Amino acid sequence: MAQISDSLDVAPESFSTETPNEEAPKAPRAVLNVSGGAVGRRKQATARVRLVPGSGSITVNGREFADYFPNKLHQQLVNDPFKVLDLLGSYDVVARISGGGPSGQAGALRLGIARALNEIDEENNRAVLKKNGFLSRDARVKERKKAGLKKARKAPQFSKR
């Protein structure tokens, strides 16, 4: 029976438990001259979004992005689909948003941007956007007020006697 040490002619220089990453060749990215549009909704807000190849400027209801969403958290939320696809600064966004508050509007804009990016290049973008949850509509909305209650669930004080 052969010894293990006999089978090695030269000792290896370094040992590694990792296997080399052999990623499947990706389909070439679509040329960034294709525009797309979509609608996103969140809570009571609706965003109609248009993506046009450009410098990365975002215009919401005719106002600059930073003016419309001064909260950095909302700005980050809206830019997330571009970040995960490495397309930050590749498209100009023109959006019309109606209804809801700042948080709902930011969520609606994010969904609209993600759907538009999906429409532009479904082969390359869909899997990444879906994995990060950007193509899912958040169905949570305000619960309706019920008769006999003060709010959706808040009841008037109850007295046993």
Curated annotation (Swiss-Prot):
List the keywords (alphabetical).
Ribonucleoprotein, Ribosomal protein
Q: Which Pfam family would be a valid example here? A: Ribosomal_S9
Q: Region annotation Disordered: residue ranges?
A: 1-28, 142-161
Transmembrane segment boundaries: none
Which molecular-function annotation in GO is an example for this chain?
RNA binding
**Top-rank lineage group of the source organism:** Bacteria
Q: Can you quote a single GO CC term?
A: small ribosomal subunit
Q: What GO biological process term is on the record, naming one?
A: translation
Keyword Ribonucleoprotein included in the entry's annotation: yes
Asked if the keyword Ribonucleoprotein belongs to this entry, the reply reads yes
Of which family is this protein a member?
Answer: Belongs to the universal ribosomal protein uS9 family.
Q: Which NCBIfam families match?
A: PRK00132.1
Name listed for the protein in its UniProt record: Small ribosomal subunit protein uS9
Q: Per the UniProt entry, what species is this protein from, by scientific name?
A: Clavibacter sepedonicus (Clavibacter michiganensis subsp. sepedonicus)
